[in-house]
């Protein structure tokens, strides 16, 4: 799934507050720049003078901070188990290099609690292959024992179609199942090194998911030993409750409750050029994909 799509409006508002009120330099992946906040996007904040830089990795952000010690640099850390280790590494390097002008604003999430929240409303989980490459498949196998079926899929068209075909055949057998259809990347044990790094530096926290609400224990934040690099603590960010456009059905799309074209703003007010919701921003988003390739035209 796309981490941008489940990132709540309030996170964008926090980043804008840091940029406009504290004058920090925001380093972010490009997809986040156009995601609407309550009043504006990061692109809109940039037009008001905010310093917004697009980077391709947290290492790029840490490197920028090292070259610009006069600036306070905050990296917008979003993603699942796949990206959290790289963000932890950037903090570890910053601490080693004595870079106290670098920190993370974290909206990282973990999948187990999301599976728990959704398992009653799904026939089959199409597990994200790159997440399972880190976490392994133990949880998927455990969920099968609870009656929850699923397959791990890769990301090419052939891999996705293979996983879907396997899922349909197994589903018709009428018994809970789990099949790893991405064995060239996903191993049962996952990546022990990545798991250990994440466990060393982070702890679980409650986290808000766009469309799903607050899911206890589904977020990731830095442990106390690394709290100097936690932007929320460093800048004492006030509680910000973001408000999404009520016409946007991004949350329902994420849960499979409706097609993107069922949303009344889809393809009209909401387009890739002028997105109303996060699902239209990223090329990994369901609405953007449906706009480009669906039967809506």
Describe each model-derived feature in a short phrase.
Residues 1-70, 84, 92-97, 103-105, ...:
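Metallocofactor- and cofactor-centric catalytic cores in central/energy metabolism, strongly enriched
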Residues 1-12, 29-32, 52-58, 108-112, ...:
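Conserved mixed alpha/beta catalytic, RNA-binding, or beta-rich assembly cores of soluble enzyme
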Residues 2-7, 31-35, 76-86, 111, ...:
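Gly/Ser/Thr-rich loops at beta-strand to alpha-helix junctions
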Residues 27-30, 75-78, 105-107, 126-128, ...:
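Short beta-strand segments
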Residues 69-74, 144-147, 244:
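Glycine/charged-rich beta-loop-alpha catalytic/anionic-binding loops adjacent to active sites
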Residues 87-89, 138-139:
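Short amphipathic alpha-helical segments
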Residues 103, 120-186:
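A conserved active-site cap/scaffold subdomain adjacent to cofactor or substrate pockets
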Residues 161-252:
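Internal helical hairpin/lid segments
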């Amino acid at each position: 799934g796309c981490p941008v799509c489940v990132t709540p409006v309030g996170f964008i508002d926090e980043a804008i507050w840091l940029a406009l009120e504290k004058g920090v330099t925001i380093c972010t992946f490009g997809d986040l720049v156009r995601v609407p906040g309550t009043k504006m996007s990061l692109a809109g904040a940039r037009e008001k003078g905010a310093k917004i830089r697009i980077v391709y990795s947290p290492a790029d952000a840490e490197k920028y901070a090292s070259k610009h010690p006069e600036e306070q640099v905050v990296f917008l850390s979003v993603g699942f188990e796949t990206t959290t280790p790289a963000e932890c590494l950037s903090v570890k390097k910053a601490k080693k290099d004595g870079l106290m002008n670098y920190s993370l604003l974290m909206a990282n999430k973990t999948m187990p609690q999301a599976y728990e929240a959704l398992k009653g409303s799904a026939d089959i989980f199409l597990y994200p292959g790159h997440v399972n490459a880190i976490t392994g498949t133990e949880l998927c196998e455990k969920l099968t024992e609870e009656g929850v079926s699923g397959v791990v899929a890769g990301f090419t068209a052939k891999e996705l179609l293979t996983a879907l075909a396997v899922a349909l055949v197994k589903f018709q057998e009428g018994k809970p199942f789990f099949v790893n259809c991405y064995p060239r990347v996903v191993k049962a044990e996952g990546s022990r090194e990545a798991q250990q790094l994440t466990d060393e530096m982070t702890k679980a926290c409650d986290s808000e998911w766009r469309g799903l609400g607050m899911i206890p224990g589904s977020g990731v934040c830095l442990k106390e030993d690394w709290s100097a690099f936690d932007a929320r603590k460093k800048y004492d960010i006030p509680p910000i409750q973001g408000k999404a456009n009520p016409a946007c059905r991004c949350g329902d799309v994420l849960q499979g409750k409706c097609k993107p074209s069922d949303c009344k703003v889809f393809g009209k007010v909401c387009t890739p050029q002028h997105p109303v919701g996060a699902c239209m921003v990223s090329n990994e988003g369901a609405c953007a994909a449906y706009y480009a390739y669906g039967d809506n035209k």
